[in-house]
UniProtKB/Swiss-Prot annotation:
Induction: Expressed in the early phase of the viral replicative cycle. Pfam families: DUF3310. Involved in the sensitivity of the virus to the host AbiV system. Coiled coil: none annotated. Belongs to the skunalikevirus SaV protein family. This is SaV protein.
Amino acid sequence: MNYGTNKHYANEYGMELNEYFKHHFSYEELAGWYTMQVLKYLVRAGKKEGESYDKDRNKALDYAGELANLSNENELTEYTTDDIMGFAQDIADDFKQWKGERNNFKSEFTKEEIKAIDERYLEFIEEV
């Protein structure tokens, strides 16, 4: 992300919103924020009028990089941007199959695949 060059993310004192987040939110809140941003841009990539697939995918990559940096700066499990993108892509793929069911999820994924995604998510959250 080019926060320094994207002045629409700065206040009148030149302070960047992302830096504000880092000073005012907990690690868990930031990790959740970055994760949701990665997912949002992966899911919408190529769908929003006027926005290219590559532009949204690059935004997802930027947020994945922020999440990897956050994890690494906090001396937790070392993640790469690719690790996070892979994890997020699994969730985005899962979302594509979701029809809005509650507690009775049915998709083209097998129960074993869903369990593996759930386990990977839980491991990721515990480590991040």
